[in-house]
Regions:
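C-terminal accessory segments of proteins
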Residues: 4-172
Length: 172
């Protein structure tokens, strides 16, 4: 839930229908099914893997986790103090998707919460329309996104621990 595009649809399947140039990788259509109008890389894909993997490029996953723990140690106390509030967490991450994922582009992507396409060729060809915007994830976006993703991972770790600890208390 703490990956922002898992908490929003936006008429583009949570960024799956938003082709982006990621650093030096141009978006390419699916070679087996170009009629689907889905491209790689896309916004959801880079938030799922590329941003975090690039951010931890200089370290291994354990060291990266330790770095996040250290970086967000002060904030983690307030996350714990707030208790388990799953609905609030979902809205918090949804708002993060709007402000820190979509609004971070110079070419604006409108927020369309009520449109739920089945694929990228739906919603008046959302995949093709987004492709024509030529959106680019540059170093500045990558840097901001890495901070957002890192915070989301730290929050998710603390909150998952809270849920598991509560479950362990309930089922000795």
């Amino acid at each position: 839930m703490h990956q922002p595009l898992h908490a929003i649809n936006n008429g583009d399947n949570g960024g799956n229908c938003v082709p982006v140039k990621y650093l030096h990788h141009e978006p390419l259509p699916n070679p087996l099914h170009p009629e689907r109008e889905d491209y790689s890389p896309n916004l959801h894909q880079i938030w799922d893997t590329e941003i975090v993997e690039r951010d931890m490029e200089i370290s291994n996953p354990h060291r990266y986790a330790d770095e996040l723990d250290e970086k967000f140690r002060a904030e983690s106390a307030s996350w714990e103090a707030a208790g388990i509030q799953v609905d609030n967490w979902a809205w918090e991450v949804h708002e993060r998707a709007e402000t820190e994922v979509y609004d971070a582009f110079s070419v604006k992507i409108p927020i369309e919460p009520d449109v739920k396409p089945k694929g990228c060729s739906d919603n008046n060809h959302i995949g093709k329309r987004q492709f024509e915007k030529h959106l680019t994830v540059d170093e500045a976006y990558q840097s901001r996104a890495a901070k957002t993703a890192g915070k989301g991972l730290a929050e998710a770790g603390v909150r998952l621990a809270m849920i598991l600890n509560e479950a362990a208390k309930s089922n000795p």
